[in-house]
């Protein structure tokens, strides 16, 4: 079906999806501008919807403000704290949802006049939960998700005599396979040892446990999950299996292009980035697998929000419905930008069965769909971003300074417990 037809049907369907619809917006007679702040590649997805939007709202211009990922979230942090230069629609990555919700500057979309709670069953459960605060306010509507996956260079594994099962059977096996790969090809197992930590701490979290802090306010960073993550990261560093390369750096993309990084633990969306701009010349060399040791975890995801001080909330909500509640729009974004859909309706589409040329013809979308269905819904906590920084700093001390793991995690716990105590007062 042509893209234009998809978008026309998409808008028509999504405006009927809730009871809010056009009645809330009313007739738009005067010229208005709807501003949307986003980062790549959500900005391109939003821009692709403008032509169809204009057919319904010819007097509403859509201005998409695009910034690099970090710059976008820095700008939105400032805008929310000062209540100035706010867009009508703000796209937020999962890791920032709790931080932005903390200040109370985002609309609760779960209640009237938005009522997204009525559509809860249509979303991947863990994604909907990620946009919900501990108090039950739905401050962000999921658009795309990041089921965790292991991407690996099939050519490098073959050269080293390593099989996929060697990487995935266990985390210890993953590291051992890395030793063989490094010896045979010179390639690092991972870009940075922290990549292992990041996935392990997000894997197989129990309901109600939380990432860093549970529902009762108990700090979890000295639990077995974190000890295991730190031990594995340290083992990777001791075996010289990481290049100490930070994600999104020039060295990172060059490592993918030159074949000096054999695997990457990430969200499924990375396969699209590798294909589209990070390392398109490596088409056919990559494969995808589930995470080692039967782990399932979420890594990233994009959400739509409305600031409380936004000027055009009704129109903003119409746009958000169009982008999140329409199977056609979600599928279009999946096809064009590899934005894995948060809407369950789309998961039944035949597109999931199509081979991915970049991954050597593998039908990896089925793999990722299975992972998405097995990921536990994890409550967000407003101290998650702070906890992430504290834990990351302690890991650096372990990797770079030889700090004892239990001491590092105990120090991280003490710092976080003080923050939790202050928050409670």
Annotate each PLM feature.
Residues 31-41, 60-65, 88-89, 139, ...:
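Short, well-ordered beta-strand elements
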Residues 41-61, 391, 409:
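Short, polar/charged alpha-helical segment
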Residues 52-123, 159-161, 166, 255, ...:
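Extracytoplasmic "Venus flytrap"/periplasmic binding protein-like
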Residues 94-147, 175, 183, 204, ...:
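Hinge/lid segment of periplasmic solute-binding proteins
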Residues 114, 273-281, 294-393, 424:
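C-terminal lobe and pocket-closing loops
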Residues 158, 164, 370-425:
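Conserved C-terminal helix/tail region of periplasmic/extracytoplasmic solute-binding proteins
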Residues 177-180, 216-245:
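Glycine-centered hinge/linker elements that transmit conformational signals in sensory
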Residues 200, 230-318:
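Extracytoplasmic/periplasmic substrate-binding proteins
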């Amino acid at each position: 079906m042509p893209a234009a037809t998809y978008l026309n049907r998409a808008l028509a369907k999504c405006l009927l999806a809730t009871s809010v619809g056009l009645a809330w917006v009313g007739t738009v007679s005067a010229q208005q501008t709807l501003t949307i702040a986003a980062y790549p590649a959500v900005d391109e997805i939003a821009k692709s919807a403008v032509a169809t939007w204009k057919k319904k709202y010819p007097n509403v211009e859509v201005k998409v403000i695009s910034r690099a990922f970090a710059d976008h979230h820095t700008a939105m942090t400032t805008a929310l704290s000062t209540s100035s230069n706010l867009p009508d629609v703000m796209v937020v990555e999962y890791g920032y949802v709790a931080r932005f919700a903390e200040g109370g500057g985002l609309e609760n979309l779960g209640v009237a006049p938005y009522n997204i709670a009525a559509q809860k069953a249509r979303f991947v459960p863990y994604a909907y939960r990620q946009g919900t605060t501990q108090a039950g306010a739905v401050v962000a509507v999921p658009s795309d998700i990041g089921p965790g996956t292991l991407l690996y260079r099939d050519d490098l594994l073959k050269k080293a005599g390593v099989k996929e099962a060697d990487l995935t059977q266990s985390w210890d096996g993953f590291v051992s396979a890395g030793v063989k790969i490094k010896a045979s090809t010179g390639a690092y197992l991972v870009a940075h040892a922290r990549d292992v930590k990041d996935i392990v701490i997000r894997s197989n979290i129990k309901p109600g446990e939380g990432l860093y802090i549970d529902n009762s306010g108990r700090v979890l960073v000295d639990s077995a999950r974190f000890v295991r993550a730190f031990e594995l990261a340290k083992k990777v560093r001791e075996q010289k299996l990481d290049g100490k390369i930070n994600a999104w750096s020039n060295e990172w993309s060059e490592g993918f292009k030159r074949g000096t990084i054999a695997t990457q633990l990430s969200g499924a969306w990375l396969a699209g980035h590798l294909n589209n701009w990070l390392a398109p010349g490596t088409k056919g060399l990559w494969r995808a697998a589930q995470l080692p040791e039967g782990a399932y975890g979420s890594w990233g995801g994009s959400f739509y929000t409305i600031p409380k001080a936004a000027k055009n909330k009704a129109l903003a909500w119409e746009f958000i419905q169009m982008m999140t509640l329409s199977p056609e729009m979600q599928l279009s974004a999946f096809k064009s930008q590899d934005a894995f859909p948060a809407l369950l309706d789309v998961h039944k589409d035949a597109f999931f069965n199509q081979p991915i040329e970049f991954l050597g013809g593998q039908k990896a979308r089925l793999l990722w769909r299975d992972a998405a269905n097995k990921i536990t819904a994890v409550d967000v906590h407003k101290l998650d971003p702070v906890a992430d920084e504290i834990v990351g700093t302690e890991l650096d001390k372990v990797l770079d300074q030889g700090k004892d793991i239990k001491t590092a995690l105990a120090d991280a716990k003490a710092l976080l417990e003080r923050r939790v105590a202050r928050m409670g007062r």
